[in-house]
Amino acid sequence: MDTQRFVITMNGDNISFIVGDNAINHLSEEAGKYDSIVIMISKTVEEMYANHIPDVGSFGNSVVKISLNDGESLKSLRNYQKIVKVLLERKVDRRSLLVYIGGGTVGDLAGFVASTYKRGVMMIAVPTTLLAQVDSSIGGKNGLDFSDVKNVIGTFYNPYMVIDDTVFLKNNSFIIREGMSEVIKYAIISGGDMYDTLNRCSIDNFDACATNIIKLSVKIKSEIVNRDFYDRTGIRSVLNLGHTIAHGIEGATKGSISHGKAVATGMLVEAHIGEKYGNTNHEVIEAIRDLMKRYGIEELNLKEIGPGNILRYISNDKKIMEGYINMPVPSEIGKVITMKATERMISDGINTFIKENDAS
């Protein structure tokens, strides 16, 4: 399938998106406009796709390549300092281009480097997982972890181009399932074209649908982010659908459950909470469950994880104020509301979900 090009304006920045098979081939042409280029690339991606990624040596007169290990531990001040030291030693100036090629953690670190080095350099994002393509590469957020707190240091900074190459997704059902949890979230939030598209496609014919799914995801998230770019008014919090329970699951399992699985089951539980307290139509629960099955995402056994363990981590969540948490719940397909949920209400919802699964 041919690549699709479109432009999204976000917080006054015009961001060019190139989406589709072999979209990365456009990188050489764009990078060639710069005399000095910094490439921050995932070692895993570099090894797996050595024959697919263009030769970075052909990008410009001066190329600094920094290969990085994936994972949350990458996002540290120490790694940031190491990279800045290399850039200074190589005399990289603020007219340079920074390109990152990798998943969400590489993007988080690269975005922070691009936004702070010499007070900001131009950046091209080449996210290589579906989760990064539909979520973390959109919205300007980047971040470093410090003192065991995730993303406590960070900025809002947009790339001027995002290249979403769908070749990186082929024959990798795990990264498709991980990303589809967030895409299903968009379908529940927005309804319309995204919901219809996901019901026409499936994990079995994902390749044929990938470009359109990514394009719709970019547009939905951008629309929401544009109304609350700096995440100050609460509008952007709708994107946290599924994440309240997901954070509890991830904490209770010490990260052994993947983010995508946690978010998908989180949406189901939050919909149960909404239904129990009169805010959610039952059809939403069935819609989430059907889409999860359609894309091969299994429901987690929360009984094994332990409702008390999940609730304990949620109770420590920074968003809890005055005994309740502002939690987005779907009221119907295409509509999400914010519900003031107490610990008791969350506990009831988790137990209702467990009982329903035990009975099925």
UniProtKB/Swiss-Prot annotation:
Signal peptide (UniProt feature, chain positions): none
Keyword flag Cytoplasm: yes
SUPFAM superfamilies for the chain: Dehydroquinate synthase-like
UniProt EC number: 4.2.3.4
Cofactor(s) for this UniProt protein: NAD(+); Co(2+); Zn(2+)
Positions of NAD(+) binding: 70-75, 128-129, 141, 150
Protein's pathway: Metabolic intermediate biosynthesis; chorismate biosynthesis; chorismate from D-erythrose 4-phosphate and phosphoenolpyruvate: step 2/7
Manner of cofactor binding, per the entry note: Binds 1 divalent metal cation per subunit. Can use either Co(2+) or Zn(2+).
Entry's localization field: Cytoplasm
Annotated binding of Zn(2+), by residue: 182, 243, 259
A Gene Ontology biological process term: aromatic amino acid family biosynthetic process
Catalytic activity field: 7-phospho-2-dehydro-3-deoxy-D-arabino-heptonate = 3-dehydroquinate + phosphate
Top-rank taxon, per record: Archaea
Keywords: Amino-acid biosynthesis, Aromatic amino acid biosynthesis, Cobalt, Cytoplasm, Lyase, Metal-binding, NAD, Nucleotide-binding, Zinc
Gene Ontology molecular function: any one: 3-dehydroquinate synthase activity
Keyword check for Zinc: yes
InterPro entries assigned to the protein according to its UniProt record, in alphabetical order: Dehydroquinate_synthase, DHQ_synth_AroB, DHQ_synth_fam, DHQS/DOIS_N, DHQS_C
Annotated PANTHER family: 3-DEHYDROQUINATE SYNTHASE (PTHR43622:SF1)
General function of this protein: Catalyzes the conversion of 3-deoxy-D-arabino-heptulosonate 7-phosphate (DAHP) to dehydroquinate (DHQ).
Family membership noted in the UniProt record: Belongs to the sugar phosphate cyclases superfamily. Dehydroquinate synthase family.
The protein's name in its UniProt record: 3-dehydroquinate synthase
